[in-house]
């Protein structure tokens, strides 16, 4: 569906100015719950500037995270879960008939209700699900591949620290830290030092895409996943579901500051899918999960997002075989963790730290 939408939205041209038509929660939720719209949702806000053909303005930093596809090919609606705003755009050149057909004939359909959390509306699964467990053979690009792509092949120096990590440098401004080859770790950190202002939202998104392409992670379905302040993150998606690494790590995370750009990434490549063997994982209704977290001390109003993602699990039958286990992941206090991890945390320490931050901000 996402590929079909992307293909058609690239053809769309706005034939009039963007018009705000909704700015209240009540009206916004009427659109959310209207079955006549096909909704495509970004995991976090993006800006109008990324869709110049829809507004003819390269510096429009208004944000949205949700497309509403109506029954007409002449109108499209852009929604912002945070502000309850919906914008109407009259368009020409796009045909979403196939998209509507795909949505109508989808093989997997689960009843959900949309619940407002701290960062917007999350789909809450109403019934227990038996979600498929997938398996993949994985591999990793060599460190020399990333050194060559990110630093080049000449003028590069290296220095190994006592932890076995090696830092490759190109002049004083660009570095790549690679893991110890004997550690079994595959986490890299690329740093480019540059005095600059932290870019605005649009440029952070565009710059992060540039660095993702620079990495050259092969055969991946990397997608935009999250944006917090100066950070923009990406995850690999399999069967439309995000894959978390090392319990809760993101595959690529770009961080912008006034003196550098950092790109932390993992080199894992989910290369060969293993035929589905019928294994499933039982997932509770989402509200039951939230109730468990509340009983553990994590208030619902502190939950930013909740999704179903894949957790990695090594298969004992082969050193490169990974099982992808469907698991609830929850974002709270700006941290992503699985349900099991949050249930083991002393949530009061997070709450106290969060309150301290709020108090300091109010001084």
Task: Locate predicted features.
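Gram-positive cell-envelope targeting signals
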Residues: 1, 362-363
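Preferential activation on post-signal-peptide N-terminal prodomains/segments
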Residues: 1-200
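A short local loop/turn or secondary-structure capping micro-motif enriched for an aromatic residue
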Residues: 85-88, 96-97, 271-275, 347-349
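Exposed beta-strand-loop-beta-strand "reactive/processing" segments of non-cytosolic proteins
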Residues: 145-191, 216-261, 266-267, 307-336
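Short, non-transmembrane alpha-helical segments in secretory-pathway proteins
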Residues: 193-230, 276-317
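Conserved histidines in hydrophobic membrane contexts and catalytic metal-binding motifs
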Residues: 208, 254, 326-334, 339-354, ...
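Short helix-loop boundary/capping segments
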Residues: 258-285
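Extracytoplasmic/periplasmic membrane-proximal domains and adjacent transmembrane bundles
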Residues: 357-359
């Amino acid at each position: 569906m996402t590929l079909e939408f992307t293909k058609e939205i690239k053809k769309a041209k706005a034939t009039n100015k963007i018009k705000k038509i909704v700015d209240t929660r009540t009206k916004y939720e009427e659109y959310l719950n209207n079955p006549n719209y096909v909704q495509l949702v970004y995991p976090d806000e993006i800006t109008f500037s990324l869709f110049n053909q829809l507004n003819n303005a390269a510096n429009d930093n208004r944000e949205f995270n949700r497309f509403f596809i109506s029954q007409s090919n002449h109108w499209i609606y852009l929604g912002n879960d945070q502000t309850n705003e919906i914008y109407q755009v009259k368009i020409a050149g796009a045909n979403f008939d196939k998209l509507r057909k795909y949505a109508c004939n989808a093989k997997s359909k689960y009843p959900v209700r949309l619940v407002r959390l701290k960062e917007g509306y999350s789909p809450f699964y109403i019934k227990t699900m038996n979600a498929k467990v997938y398996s993949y053979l994985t591999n990793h690009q060599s460190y020399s591949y990333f050194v060559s792509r990110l630093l080049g092949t000449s003028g590069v120096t290296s220095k190994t620290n006592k932890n076995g990590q090696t830092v490759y440098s190109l002049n004083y401004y660009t570095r790549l830290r690679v893991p110890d080859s004997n550690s079994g770790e595959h986490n890299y950190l690329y740093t480019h030092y540059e005095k600059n202002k932290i870019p605005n939202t649009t440029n952070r998104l565009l710059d992060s895409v540039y660095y993702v392409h620079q990495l050259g992670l092969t055969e991946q379905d990397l997608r935009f996943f999250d944006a917090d302040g100066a950070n923009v993150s990406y995850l690999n998606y399999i069967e439309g579901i995000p894959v978390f690494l090392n319990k809760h790590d993101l595959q690529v995370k770009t961080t912008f500051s006034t003196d550098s750009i950092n790109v932390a990434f993992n080199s894992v490549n989910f290369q060969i899918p293993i035929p589905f063997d019928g294994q499933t994982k039982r997932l509770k209704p989402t509200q039951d999960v939230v109730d468990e977290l509340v009983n553990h001390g994590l208030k619902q109003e502190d939950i930013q997002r909740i999704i179903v993602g894949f957790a990695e699990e090594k298969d004992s039958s082969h050193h490169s075989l990974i099982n992808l286990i469907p698991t609830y992941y929850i974002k709270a206090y700006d941290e992503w963790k699985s349900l099991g991890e949050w249930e083991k945390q002393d949530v009061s320490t997070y709450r106290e730290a969060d309150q301290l931050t709020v108090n300091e901000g109010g001084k």
